[in-house]
């Protein structure tokens, strides 16, 4: 899968190539592509499988879906670091810390553009259409979070809407895209979507709790 991604994200420009290499090597554990591959295996029919690189239960369409969601996520993180003025990402310098925010914004846009281009070049329009709408949802979540960042009146419903749009929506799409990639029945696609949404909400709530505990633990009385 890593080679599949790298083969589609390269640049002849020296600076863009450096930024891409750094960003792609700073990616996390790949939760979203793992969800795509898991749900494709759960919903695929035995006679509807074309193996890629010897990997069981993984068709070229599934690889494409996994790549699309992972790189949309990667682009969103690059932009997140610019918005948050974050100097690090997973223990390494962020793109904006190394190459300034203006270049990092362009990098995020470049990754997003190459992701969409890869999807269209594949001619798998049902997959692209299924996944690409999540970009707008993520953007809405980012604006909502910014709107409520210093709002002491933020409600539980506000919080749930923010984490759904920023995090759970793409994990939900990842889960349903796995089913779409193997041409699963609509009922299976919907079940996987609901599973992904629940997983994404739980994932972000747990992450926020851990962040809060970390902040509380760092407070010292003087």
Where are these regions (language model features)?
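Mg2+-dependent prenyl diphosphate-binding active-site environment of isoprenoid biosynthetic enzymes
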Residues: 6, 10-215
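Conserved small/polar residues in nucleotide/adenosyl-binding loops
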Residues: 217-222
